[in-house]
Regions:
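A charged N-terminal "starter" segment
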Residues: 1-136, 171, 175-179, 183, ...
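General structural feature for long, well-ordered alpha-helical segments within catalytic domains
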Residues: 11, 27-30, 34, 38, ...
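Conserved, mostly hydrophobic/aromatic
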Residues: 31, 55, 77, 109, ...
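General beta-strand structural signal in soluble alpha/beta enzymes
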Residues: 52, 73-76, 96, 117-120, ...
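Glycine-rich nucleotide phosphate-binding loop and flanking beta-alpha elements
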Residues: 58, 81, 102, 124-125, ...
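Glycine-rich, aromatic-flanked loop segments that form ligand/cofactor-binding clefts
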Residues: 133-147
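Active-site loop/helix belt of alpha/beta enzymes
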Residues: 144-291
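Charged (often Lys/Glu-rich) extended helix/loop segments that serve as interaction or gating elements
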Residues: 260, 265-421
């Protein structure tokens, strides 16, 4: 089985005349079509908003595309908040969901008018002492503990997660914050990662809807929204069926009608934070084969490395690889596709069946649009690659330049340190 890249060999050969490999390339048409579908799938809920997880793809050009479709920003750090502000997001277009939060970041988020989503019960006192009051709109992150399991066998273990509060803490926290002036309350939860099933969001929604009904009864608080967070995944392997966002939206709608409407809570807004689903399939890492090595295994060395895409090295994650121009060639070879870091886990593929790869071939590493460039780092003195946008009209636009040695040495600018290129 195979995946079809959104860029051709001929297009890449033109692109590299201006922008050398490696580079991350994003598909504007795909991003737009998907963002439109998400809005349509949840149009039944008047208050719906997708808060794009900035951590997934922190690029102003991407954020501004999503903004056209009503998306907000889910931020988890000071610099992500600063980026959201610079892109013109303001007020409740920003959700600030962080953990182990420096107090000055609460202040910055509050000054932007962002909705603050508290990760810990002790943060209630922290935020009151820092701001001088409790904001009128506030949210808490819920952790049910135990194991979260779906009928198809997908499971995760919230009880081992550092995030969120217990139900008892949220009940007590809502009571405290209501007494201190909070008027609009929300609940947030993230219970499983990269679920490739239409079942996850509806099941999570039902659990959270039942929780907020109980919260309203116990505390008398006005529940303004339920934030389903992320967790809706993408099919990294070609044998997986992609999620159907319309089926997911309808499943959440069904749970809403079954639980919230009878409780007189049909004004509750639904929020989501689907960074991976919004972007991953619409980005790829384009790299060139520059070496081959024949020892106990067959190796293809490329000009990208884990600095450009960390997921395979960090998690052992599968990313499909297409050799451009050889899409229909038989996969007769078994390769490890590797980068140049001085780490043996710097491998994009291990024992992968691929066509014969020659030096100079261009490889597309699929599904890097989220948590791809964003997770880059500078180990071994490697430099981050450029980010390019394949625009809807077919033209290519640079949306982040490649790093240079000057960037690597920039933080020594306070010393008498000189380098030569």
């Amino acid at each position: 089985m195979r995946k079809t890249p959104f860029v051709t060999k001929e297009q890449v050969e033109e692109i590299v005349k201006t922008y050398p490999t490696p580079f991350h390339l994003y598909d504007e048409a795909g991003i737009r079509a998907n963002a439109k579908a998400v809005q349509e799938a949840f149009a039944w809920n008047k208050g719906f908003r997708e808060y794009f997880a900035v951590k997934a793809t922190p690029n102003p050009f991407i954020l501004n595309i999503l903004k056209e479709y009503g998306c907000g920003c889910d931020c988890s750090s000071l610099t992500e908040l600063m980026m959201a502000k610079a892109c013109g997001f303001e007020g409740e277009q920003i959700m600030f969901s962080s953990n182990d939060t420096p107090l000055e970041e609460f202040t910055f988020a509050n000054n932007l008018g962002a909705i603050i989503n508290l990760d810990d019960f002790t943060h209630i006192q922290c935020i009151e002492e820092t701001l001088g009051y409790i904001p009128e709109t506030i949210s808490c992150r819920y952790n049910p503990g135990g194991v979260f399991e779906m009928s198809n066998g997908i499971m995760d273990n919230p009880g081992d997660s550092k995030y969120g509060m217990t139900k008892e803490q949220i009940i007590e926290g809502f009571k405290i914050m209501k007494e201190k002036g909070a008027k609009n309350f929300g609940v947030h939860a993230f219970l499983a990662s990269n679920t490739v099933t239409n079942e996850y969001y509806p099941q999570l929604a039902k659990q959270l809807f039942e929780l907020v009904v109980e919260l309203k009864e116990e505390t008398g608080c006005h529940i303004a929204f339920v934030n389903l967070s992320g967790g809706v995944g993408v099919p990294y392997t070609p044998d997986q069926e992609p999620n159907d966002i319309y089926a997911i939206g309808e499943g959440v709608h069904k749970a809403y009608d079954e639980v919230l409407v009878p409780a007189g809570m049909d004004d509750v807004a639904i929020f989501s934070e689907m960074g991976r689903f919004m972007l991953a399939p619409y980005g790829c890492l384009v790299t060139q084969a520059i070496h081959e090595k024949h020892i106990y295994k067959e190796y293809i060395g490329v000009d990208a490395c884990a600095v450009n895409l960390m997921r395979p090295a960090m998690y052992g994650s599968y990313h499909h690889i297409t050799v451009l121009g050889k899409e229909d060639a038989p996969c007769t070879e078994t390769y490890d596709v590797v980068g140049s870091l001085c780490e043996n886990n710097d491998k994009f593929a291990i024992d992968r069946k691929l066509p014969v790869i020659n030096k100079g071939d261009y490889l597309v590493i699929h599904d890097t649009g989220a948590h791809g460039f964003a997770m880059g780092y500078s180990y071994n003195g490697k430099l981050k690659s450029a980010e390019l946008l394949l625009q809807s009209d077919g033209n290519v636009k640079m949306i982040r330049r490649a790093e240079t040695p000057a960037d690597y040495f920039a933080t020594f600018d306070c010393f008498d340190f000189k380098f030569e290129q």
